[in-house]
A protein has these predicted regions:
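A general structural motif
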Residues: 234, 323-332
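A structural feature that tracks compact, well-ordered secondary-structure segments
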Residues: 240-242
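Short glycine/threonine-rich loop-to-helix capping motif typified by GTGT followed
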Residues: 221-223, 353-367
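Nucleotide/phosphate-binding catalytic cleft detector across ATP-hydrolyzing
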Residues: 2-43, 47-231, 248-250, 259, ...
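Glycine-rich beta-strand-to-loop/alpha-helix junction loops that act as flexible
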Residues: 104-109, 346-356
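Hydrophobic, well-ordered secondary-structure elements that form the walls
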Residues: 331, 350, 398
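A cytosolic small-molecule/anion-sensing beta-strand core signal
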Residues: 245
Length: 433
């Protein structure tokens, strides 16, 4: 299988615990649109994709600084709604359409996962779709606190009469069907607040999707998932981990550390404002102290109206390397705890905004003692080159999830597309370059 989303069956089903919102069914098949909405700690990103016979064409991208979110969780409804509206408006301008529904990502340390299994008797001695549905229902029958809900039930394998390793059991003969699954749960209130913010921004939520699951569809290929790979999505407020082996997700967790913690350390260490620290990190940052010229000097803005100061770049790099290594060490501990670190024969794939930090791949290879690559969304048509950046991994992956789940909606042109693409692309180019 080429790079792209998981199949609908691999993504799994929601449970009765997640009925706080209803999925919006697809509307028509002509010129279909899918929209992914990534609600991050540092940015809100909207990506619009058009379903084609070849796959997906990117037709619109919008980003806006995130306000009202912390660690992937909504902490201010009004600010979050405003960020969503701005990102959606920019994507609409580029795509030349009106956006009415989205696939929204969810993240945060409130997300938890576990492995489960279910067993049923096969009524007709041949596995049917009804049997598969029943065994998944049995597997997701778990005790949950009242304030949590199931987001995903992800099949790992099916077993028919002790024959294991089956991924597509329909049509097979047998009397006993077993399913081993990976279940992802989240705080109900956190999911409800995401849905509420989208609705206040005049958007219907077609589904809420774990962000690392979405990212995996955009940046991992089938060979990596088969051999064993860890996807590590390091964003502004959290670092998300998803481990795949034998083409199924085996472990997932979220670490409450990300790029903002690096920025905070820079702010304290260099005695400058957070905004200044973020600019310095992006302009001069490096995750390996040995990789920078020890004689190089940078200018640092001061607080309280004082004059800017000059400091050795090596001081900045030492601060960044220390915090980045701490984040990677914690992630390695999570991989050891999962029991799969020795099975990652395809290594580690880093994505998310922090993966753009120079030197982080080399540092990660030292920490994990295995090959590491930077994952970017690939195999998109249209404006696909625009999203070939780790910051778009989640939003692009949400498009693939939506495509696999028949989430296309008919496109309504609201303005001339070529002109709007040109104007928005110029804004995007100025912002990121």
């Amino acid at each position: 299988m080429a790079q792209g989303g998981l199949s609908g069956q691999e993504y799994g089903l929601h449970s009765p615990h997640s009925r706080e919102f209803e999925r919006i069914p697809p509307m028509g098949k002509k010129e279909e649109l899918i929209v992914g909405l990534d609600l991050g700690t540092t940015k809100v990103c909207t990506v619009v994709g058009e379903v084609t016979t070849e796959g997906l064409d990117i037709v619109g991208v919008g980003t806006y600084p995130s306000a009202g979110l912390r660690g992937g969780v909504v902490v201010n409804i009004d600010q979050t709604v405003n960020s969503i509206k701005k990102a959606v408006e920019e994507a609409e301008l580029m795509a030349g359409c009106d956006i009415s529904s989205v696939f929204a990502g969810v993240a945060g340390t409130h997300v938890q996962s576990l492995n489960s299994h279910g067993v049923i008797a096969i009524k007709s001695r041949e596995v049917t779709q009804s049997d598969v549905t029943r065994v998944l229902d049995a597997a997701k029958t778990i005790a949950l606190p009242f304030d949590r809900q199931i987001l995903h039930v992800l099949p790992q394998q099916y077993i028919v009469d002790d024959q294991d390793g089956i991924h597509h059991p329909i049509g097979m003969a047998g009397v006993r069907l077993e399913a081993k699954v990976h279940i992802i749960t989240a705080m109900t209130s956190a999911v409800q607040n995401i849905v509420k913010c989208c609705e206040r921004a005049q958007l219907q939520v077609q589904d809420v999707v774990l962000e690392s699951l979405a990212s995996s569809g955009a940046v991992l290929d089938s060979d990596e998932k088969q051999l064993g790979v860890a996807l590590i999505d390091i964003g502004g407020g959290t670092s998300e981990i998803a481990v795949f082996q034998n083409n199924a997700i085996r472990h997932s967790t979220v670490v409450g550390l990300g790029g903002n913690h690096i920025t905070s350390d820079i702010s304290v260490g260099l005695r400058c404002a957070m905004d200044e620290a973020e600019k310095i990190k992006k302009k001069y940052g490096c995750a390996l102290a040995e990789a920078v010229n020890q004689q190089e000097v940078i200018e640092v803005g001061s607080v309280g109206g004082q004059k800017p100061r000059q400091l050795a770049q090596s001081i900045l790099t030492q601060i960044i390397e220390a915090r980045t290594k701490e984040i990677l060490d914690i992630i390695e501990w999570e991989l050891v705890r999962s029991g799969f670190i020795e099975s990652l024969h395809a290594g580690v794939v880093l994505t998310g905004g922090v993966s753009l930090l120079p030197g982080i791949r080399e540092l990660a290879e030292r920490v994990f003692d295995m090959p590491v690559r930077i994952g970017v969304p690939c195999n998109f048509g249209g404006l696909g080159d625009v999203v070939k950046n780790p910051i778009y991994s989640t939003a692009a992956g949400l498009l693939l999830y939506g495509k696999d789940h028949g989430g296309g909606l008919p496109m309504r042109d609201s303005r001339g597309r070529l002109g709007s693409i040109f104007e928005t692309f110029k804004r995007w180019w100025r912002e990121f370059w």
